[in-house]
From Swiss-Prot:
Its main location: cytoplasm. Keywords: ATP-binding, Cytoplasm, Kinase, Magnesium, Metal-binding, Nucleotide metabolism, Nucleotide-binding, Phosphoprotein, Transferase. This is Nucleoside diphosphate kinase. Its cofactor is Mg(2+). Gene3D superfamilies: Nucleoside diphosphate kinase-like domain. HAMAP family: NDP_kinase (MF_00451). The active site is at H117. Belongs to the NDK family. Pfam families: NDK. GO terms for biological process: CTP biosynthetic process; GTP biosynthetic process; UTP biosynthetic process. Homotetramer. It comes from Pectobacterium atrosepticum (strain SCRI 1043 / ATCC BAA-672) (Erwinia carotovora subsp. atroseptica).
């Protein structure tokens, strides 16, 4: 059994729908432990820094604006094969392609306003968790 950590964001559209609790319940029902969590509003600098790998792509400016449009929840999830399992729970990036019962099928409004973000690799998860949380904000539980 490989216990991993992954990073997740509940995006502004899902926060606006008051879906935080429902999404967190899905994480926990899937066997994840939420080891860090906080609500915040991204500044332009934070949003551009977080999505820096997409700078220059056609969707970058719209994504940054959307991520600044309201509060978000950021969380670190811990569990077996966490990165891939979270991606399975989220569903396809484009909600039009997301399977029924996935977070994006249930809460997304569009390709950009797709309700949740999740790390795509262990390396990304480590970088993304460190972007938002200091080591003393991570609270693993036995």
């Amino acid at each position: 059994m490989t216990i991993e950590r992954t990073f997740s964001i509940v995006k502004p559209n899902a926060v606006a729908k008051n879906a935080i609790g429902a999404i967190y319940a899905r994480f926990e029902s899937a066997g994840f432990t939420i080891v860090a969590s906080k609500m915040l509003r991204l500044s332009r600098e934070q949003a551009e820094g977080f999505y820096a790998e997409h700078k220059g792509k056609p969707f970058f400016d719209g994504l940054v604006e959307f991520m600044m449009s309201g509060p978000i929840m950021v969380q670190a999830l811990e569990g077996e094969n966490a990165v891939q399992r979270n991606r399975d729970i989220m569903g396809a990036t484009n909600p039009a392609n997301a399977l029924a019962g996935t977070l994006r099928a249930d809460y997304a409004d569009s390709f950009t306003a797709n309700a949740v973000h999740g790390s795509d690799s262990i390396e990304s998860a480590q970088r993304e968790i460190a972007y938002f949380f200091s080591d003393d904000e991570i609270c693993p539980r036995a």
